[in-house]
Structure formats: C-alpha cells, structure tokens
Amino acid sequence: MFGSSRGGVRGGQDQFNWEDVKTDKQRENYLGNSLMAPVGRWQKGRDLTWYAKGRAPCAGPSREEELAAVREAEREALLAALGYKNVKKQPTGLSKEDFAEVCKREGGDPEEKGVDRLLGLGSASGSVGRVAMSREDKEAAKLGLSVFTHHRVESGGPGTSAASARRKPRAEDQTESSCESHRKSKKEKKKKKKRKHKKEKKKKDKEHRRPAEATSSPTSPERPRHHHHDSDSNSPCCKRRKRGHSGDRRSPSRRWHDRGSEA
C-alpha cells in the first residue's frame, strides 16, 4: 500500500554537529563558525568569548547629578570672571623635557647640573637671610659651574666671619680653575680650526695647479715649430724664392714688352 521509504535523514537540528562543520569545505557559509567551529592553531585552547564575560554593570552618574555638576562649574567660572573669586592655579611640576631645555639654555649638560643649581626654581624664605654673590661667583654661575650660595651674610658674630673667610678662597680657587680650563679649551679649539683651515687651503691650491699644468703642457711643444718656420722664412733661399714668385706674378703683356725691349 505504501511505498518503501528511502534511507537517510533530512538533516534536522538533532542531526547537526559543529564538529562536522570543521571538516566541511563550505564551513565559511555557516553563521557563527568562527566561534563554534574554530580552525587553526591560534584558536585552539583559547577562550574566544572572553570579551563577553566578567563585565560588571557600571553605574554612572544620573542625569540630575550631571546637570548639577555643570551648573556648579558654570557658576564658579562666572564668579572668577567677575573677580569675586580667586582662581586656584595648580602648580605644574618640572618634567624631564623642561629640565633638559633649561639646562640647554644655561649652556651645560643636564647630567652635570642639579635642580638646586638652576636659577629661578623656588624662592628663599626670609629666615634664611640675604645671599651675597660676588663678581667671581657670578662669572662661575654664567659658565655653568656650581656655586655655594647657602651661607648667610650677617653683620655680627666672629664665627660667621671666619666661616665666610674659609669659604671665599674655596670659591675663588674653583672659579680660577674653571676659568683656566675654559681658556685652555678655547685655545685648543682655535688651534684645531687653524689646522683645518691650512689643510683646506693646501688642497685648493693643489686643485688650482693641476688644471693650469694640464693646459700649459700641450701648448709648449708647438712654440718652437713656429720659431723654426720664422727662421726658415728669414733664410736667403726663401728670399730668392719669394723674389722669383714675385717676378712671375707680372702680367703676360708686361713680359712680352720686356722681351721686345731686350731684342
């Protein structure tokens, strides 16, 4: 009554398996194959859905709180613009780049200088006292050398005068040694520049001499030839030839006339 049913299945959901998709040639056509049927050594043994796990719901500020914060900031800005409120300036620290720029302006290396040696960093309090900078100390500071400026200058006290007398010769010795070293380095630089300048002059002179010699060498053997030709022209044989040619150059009528007169 009923025909024989064919074997096999229709491929329902119960017959589907992602492991079979891995070996299928058309696996790229299956939706979600990169997560459910990963192929390759970079996907094996890794959690490919890590981005969807461990997320805690972050409760941000409500709309009313945001509006209140904006209004407060606008009110403070208005008061500062009208002059009713002082603006709080946050001090910015000196970064490494700024420190290097300051050292370059002073004319020294940043490694040789310290922060306490730079001018304009911080201010001394009133209790420290007045700092005296002599002419030599100022010169040393311009050269980028360390100057001891932490001693006080007070009118009274024998101990302070003795300490200052001890410190002065040290500073003077430092400045003298620094000046001498600076002069020596300048002299050496000048000598090197002079040597380089002399070498360059010698090279230029050699280069100028070479083309002059090259141009003068081919013209030298031609000169005696011209002199030889002139000497030949001045010889008596050449003079006779010239006379003969000059006589032959006369017109034929003149020649016949001369012959008739001779006859």
From Swiss-Prot:
Specify whether Ubl conjugation is a keyword of the entry.
Answer: yes
* Keyword terms of this UniProt record: Isopeptide bond, Phosphoprotein, Ubl conjugation
Compositionally biased residues, Gly residues: 1-11
One GO MF term attached to the UniProt entry: RNA binding
For bias type Low complexity, the affected ranges are 117-132
What the entry lists under InterPro entries is as follows:
MMTA2_N, MMTAG2-like
Which spans does this entry mark as compositional bias, Basic and acidic residues?
A: 105-116
Q: Which residues carry this modification: Phosphoserine?
A: S123, S127, S164, S216, S217, S220
> Which PANTHER family does the record associate with it?
MULTIPLE MYELOMA TUMOR-ASSOCIATED PROTEIN 2, MULTIPLE MYELOMA TUMOR-ASSOCIATED PROTEIN 2 FAMILY MEMBER
Q: What is this protein called?
A: Multiple myeloma tumor-associated protein 2
